[in-house]
Design a protein with these regions (language model features):
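An N-terminal assembly and electron-transfer interface module characteristic of large anaerobic redox
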Residues: 1-285
């Protein structure tokens, strides 16, 4: 049994409140490796529902290890069967990747959108955004192969760097695609930028963008203007973060300038320790 399998996804499902003003409720299902994305997605869906606008979100999600539990896996399959949007990220555990593929493949055509961020090739093939799929990108196979290779390396190579490499490579491929496919590919790139940002606000705008482009009908799209979908907020790949600072710092000099000019604290006592933590980027943003 996995350490995660005592948690039922049904206990954290996000649904619109009763007597809401939503004209359409969109069902989204996700599978992720990192729990911080689970938290951000939950808050993003709640934020959309609390606006009580034309669109509501019914969100259910799983950490990938939770799918080892038979009941969770059956719940996942039932959720997928009625989903509008499916999202997955960092699915690199082979047996669990196969479970995801087996659950989602029969319903891929029914999904309005399926967005798969770097995962094993068979999972990446579940991507579906309009006319775009990863299979259409001639270089996608080698890029994904590189991602898997780096994931397995023991020299400390950053898997995050590999994700960013994929993001940076895709624009150069777009010029070889027909216009319609290029537009959908750009949506995938934009989705990736929202995802790498990882904040509640970024993921809220990600869900709204996908809903607007692929789920809701034309007569409702004008009403989405009240949501004011924002561009992705980006963060540096490497940096220094302080909980009291207004932003992340990209250099030690920037951080020291801010620290030395703070007026919200007393001059430092020489005996006061400074504590630094080394964290993955996704744990901060």
């Amino acid at each position: 049994e996995s350490m995660f399998t005592q948690v039922r996804s049904a206990n954290r499902r996000v649904s619109p409140v009763e007597d809401n003003k939503h004209k359409v409720v969109i069902k989204a299902v996700y599978v992720v490796l990192e729990p911080q994305y689970q938290n951000s997605l939950t808050e993003a869906a709640k934020s959309i529902n609390e606006m009580n606008g034309p669109v509501g979100i019914d969100l259910s999600g799983y950490l990938i290890e939770e799918l080892r539990n038979d009941k969770n896996y059956e719940d996942f399959k039932a959720d997928i069967a009625s989903a509008d949007i499916f999202v997955a990220s960092l699915i690199f555990i082979e047996d669990l990747a196969q479970k995801v593929v087996e659950a989602v493949s029969p319903y891929k055509e029914n999904l309005k959108a399926s967005i798969i961020f770097p995962s094993m090739p068979e999972v990446m093939r579940l991507n579906k955004l309009g006319s775009f799929s990863m299979a259409q990108l001639g270089q996608s196979k080698s890029i994904i192969g590189d991602l898997i290779k780096k994931k397995k390396e023991s020299d400390g190579a950053s898997f995050q760097d590999s994700m960013l490499k994929l993001l940076n490579t895709l624009p150069s491929i777009l010029k070889y695609l027909p216009v319609e496919k290029a537009q959908d590919a750009r949506t995938f790139i934009l989705s990736f930028q929202y995802w790498l940002g990882g904040t509640t606000e970024n993921l809220k705008n990600f869900l709204l963008m996908i809903s607007e482009k692929y789920v809701i009908t034309e007569n409702l799209k004008d009403q989405l203007e009240e949501f004011k979908i924002q561009d992705p907020e980006t963060f540096p790949d490497l940096g220094i973060w302080h909980p009291m600072a207004p932003n992340m710092f990209e250099s030690l000099k920037e951080y020291q300038n801010w620290e030395n000019n703070r007026n919200d604290i007393k001059p430092k006592d020489n005996k006061t320790p400074t504590i630094g933590l080394v964290l993955q980027r996704s744990h901060i943003v």
